[in-house]
Amino acid sequence: LLALAWLLLPAGPASAAQLAGVDLPDATEADGKVLVLNGLGLREATLMMVDVYVAGLYLEAKSTDPAAIVAADRTKRLVLKFVRSVGRENLVKAFSDGLDKNAGERAAAVAPGFARLNAAMDDVKKGDTLILTYVPGAGTTVRLKDVDVATIEGEDFQSVLFSIWLGPAPLNRSLRDGLLGVDR
């Protein structure tokens, strides 16, 4: 009887996933939709593999197919929690490199959106968060250090933006695998 009573107790708070000492919730909400944590990854940079941020990808439904995630005109969110300070110029360079490697023939069409994204960037410190949320019909909201700094319209823009992490030439393959939930 006690075992049955234990099973009927209400569940505790939503659990969280952890990577490199950073906790991210298993779910979040955007535009009235619940988004589930698809996976976590660690961005490592330079030849010395310096930890830069922990990223979490949130989707309406889990998926391990990067092309389908990028192409889907559905609400999605990428959360970057920085584990070290990064200068604005390094953030802009990373976005520019990702654009060059993943935009292909869409580069000219999405260049104005990336110019707005780069203009919205600022230096980040350890503990700061960058959140990129795409909502169909509304665009991609860029939230940096708890402030909405830009909303960039266009399904093409979000597709190229999310390709930086999920496309054929991602920032790190291990980061992409983590975001797809296949590395854990």
Spans of features found by a protein language model:
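Flexible glycine-rich active-site/ligand-binding loops centered on an Asp-His dyad
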Residues: 149-175
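Short strand-turn-strand beta-turns centered on an Asx-Gly dipeptide
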Residues: 144-147
